[in-house]
C-alpha cells in the first residue's frame, strides 16, 4: 500500500475542500442576498453545484478509467484553482449561478477520481483508507465554513457587506485552490497512478465501463444505501436548526453545536469503522448504520431539550459513520480495478441525488404533515431500504473486507 500517496491525497483534499467550503457556506448565500436574491433563488445558488455533480461525476470517473487518474485529477484541481477568479467579475445573480455551476465541476471531477486512486492503492485496507480520505475532507469543510463567516464579519458584517467583502473572501478561495493544485501537481507527477486502459476505442471503453458498473445491482444497492442515508442527513442539516430554535426553544449557538456534534462524531468514527469493516465485513455495518440513523431521526421531533437532542445527533453521526465507512469500500470490492473510477462516479452521483433530495423531500413533508410525521416517514425509508440491500447483496461472491 502506498501510504505516501494516500497522505498526499489527503493533504490535497483538505486544501481543496477548505477552499470549496470557504466559497459556499455562509458566504455564498450572503453573496446571493447582496445581489438581491430571494429565499428560493438563494436555494438554487447553493444547490446548483450539486446538480453538476449529479450529471458529471459518473462520466468523470469513467473517463479516468480510460485516460488515467493523473490527468483527470489535475483537470478537477484546475477547477478548484481557476474558477474562483470568476467570482471577481460577478455583478448579477444569474452570473453567480453560472459560476457556481462551473465551480461544481471541481468536486464532480476530483472527488470520485481521488477515491478511485485510494481504492487502487489501499489493497485490503480500502475501508480504512477511504474513510481517512473522507474524514480529512470533512475536516477541511468544517474549517472552511466558519473561516468564511469570520471573514465576512471582520470585513463589515452582513449589513455592511460590499462587493469588496466578497472579492476578498473569494481571493482567499482562489489562493487555497491554487495551493491544492500545486501540491497535486507535485504529488501526481512524482507518484504512479492508474494509467487507464489501452484496448479498444475510447468511446467503446467509456460506454462499456458505465454499462458494466451501473448494470451491477450490487453496486447500485451499495450506493443507494449511501444515497438514502444522505437523504436523511440532508433533511437533518436543513431542518434540525429550524426545529431546535423554533420548536425546542434553543439558541442559534446551541443549534450549531447539535450539527457540530453530529459531524465531529462521523469524522472521528469513520476511520475506526472503516478499519473494522476491512476485517469483519461491510454489509452488517451498513445495516447497523441505517438502523442507527433511523431511530434517533424518528425520535428528534419528540425531544425538546439540548441534552437529548445532542445525544440523538451523536447517535445519528455514529450511524452515518457506519454506513459511509463501508459503502464506498464495498463498491470498490464489487468492481474490477479497471472500473474503480466509474464505480466511484456512480457512487458519487447517487450520493449527490440523496443529499440534494433530502431538504426538498423533507421540506414538502414538514410543510404538509409537520415534523413528527415527516421525520417518521423518512426514518421508515431508511428501515425499508434494509431488506432491499440484503436481497441485492445475497450471494455477491465477494469476500467482504478482503477484496
Give residue ranges: language-model regions:
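Juxtamembrane intracellular "pre-TM" segments in multi-pass secondary transporters
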Residues: 1-3, 189-222
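Helix-loop boundary and gating motifs at the non-cytosolic
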Residues: 2-50, 220-225, 230-248
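Central cavity-lining transmembrane alpha-helices of secondary-active solute carriers
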Residues: 47-61, 260-272
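Structural signature of the two symmetry-related core transmembrane helices
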Residues: 71-85, 284-299
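Paired small-residue
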Residues: 94-102, 296, 307-315
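Cytoplasmic helix-loop-helix junction between adjacent transmembrane helices
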Residues: 99-138, 329-330
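Helix-loop-helix hairpin linking two adjacent transmembrane segments in secondary transporters
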Residues: 133-185, 372
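C-terminal membrane-cytosol helix-exit motif in multi-pass small-molecule transporters
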Residues: 174-195, 385-393
Amino acid at each position: 500500500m502506498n501510504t505516501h500517496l494516500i497522505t498526499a491525497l489527503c493533504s490535497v483534499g483538505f486544501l481543496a475542500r477548505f477552499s470549496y467550503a470557504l466559497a459556499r457556506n455562509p458566504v455564498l448565500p450572503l453573496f446571493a442576498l447582496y445581489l438581491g436574491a430571494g429565499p428560493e433563488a438563494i436555494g438554487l445558488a447553493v444547490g446548483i453545484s450539486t446538480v453538476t455533480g449529479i450529471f458529471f461525476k459518473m462520466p468523470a470517473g469513467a473517463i479516468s478509467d480510460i485516460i488515467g487518474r493523473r490527468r483527470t485529477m489535475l483537470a478537477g484541481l484546475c477547477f478548484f484553482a481557476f474558477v474562483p477568479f470568476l467570482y471577481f467579475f460577478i455583478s448579477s445573480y444569474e452570473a453567480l449561478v453560472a459560476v457556481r455551476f462551473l465551480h461544481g465541476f471541481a468536486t464532480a471531477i476530483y472527488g470520485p477520481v481521488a477515491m478511485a486512486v485510494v481504492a487502487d492503492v489501499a489493497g485490503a485496507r480500502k475501508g480504512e483508507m477511504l474513510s481517512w480520505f473522507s474524514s480529512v475532507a470533512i475536516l477541511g469543510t468544517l474549517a472552511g465554513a466558519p473561516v468564511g463567516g469570520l471573514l465576512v464579519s471582520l470585513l463589515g458584517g452582513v449589513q455592511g457587506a460590499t462587493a469588496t467583502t466578497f472579492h476578498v473572501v473569494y481571493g482567499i478561495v482562489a489562493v487555497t485552490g491554487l495551493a491544492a493544485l500545486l501540491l497535486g501537481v507535485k504529488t501526481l507527477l512524482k507518484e504512479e497512478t492508474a494509467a487507464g486502459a489501452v484496448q479498444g476505442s475510447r468511446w467503446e471503453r467509456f460506454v462499456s465501463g458505465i454499462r458494466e458498473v451501473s448494470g451491477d445491482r450490487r453496486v447500485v444497492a451499495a450506493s443507494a444505501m449511501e444515497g438514502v442515508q444522505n437523504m436523511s442527513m440532508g433533511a437533518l442539516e436543513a431542518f434540525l436548526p429550524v426545529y431546535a430554535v423554533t420548536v425546542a426553544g434553543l439558541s442559534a449557538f446551541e443549534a450549531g453545536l447539535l450539527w457540530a456534534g453530529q459531524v465531529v462524531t462521523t469524522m472521528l468514527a469513520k476511520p475506526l469503522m472503516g478499519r473494522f469493516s476491512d476485517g469483519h465485513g461491510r454489509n452488517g455495518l451498513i445495516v447497523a448504520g441505517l438502523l442507527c440513523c433511523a431511530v434517533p431521526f424518528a425520535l428528534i421531533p419528540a425531544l425538546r431539550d439540548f441534552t437529548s437532542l445532542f445525544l440523538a445527533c451523536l447517535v445519528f453521526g455514529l450511524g452515518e459513520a457506519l454506513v459511509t465507512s463501508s459503502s464506498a469500500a464495498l463498491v470498490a470490492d464489487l468492481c474490477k480495478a479497471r472500473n474503480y473510477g466509474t464505480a466511484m462516479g456512480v457512487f458519487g452521483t447517487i450520493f449527490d441525488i440523496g443529499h440534494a433530495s433530502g431538504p426538498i423531500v423533507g421540506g414538502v413533508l414538514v410543510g404538509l404533515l409537520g415534523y413528527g410525521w415527516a421525520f417518521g416517514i423518512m426514518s421508515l425509508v431508511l428501515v425499508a431500504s434494509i431488506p432491499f440491500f440484503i436481497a441485492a447483496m445475497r450471494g455477491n461472491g465477494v469476500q467482504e473486507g478482503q477484496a
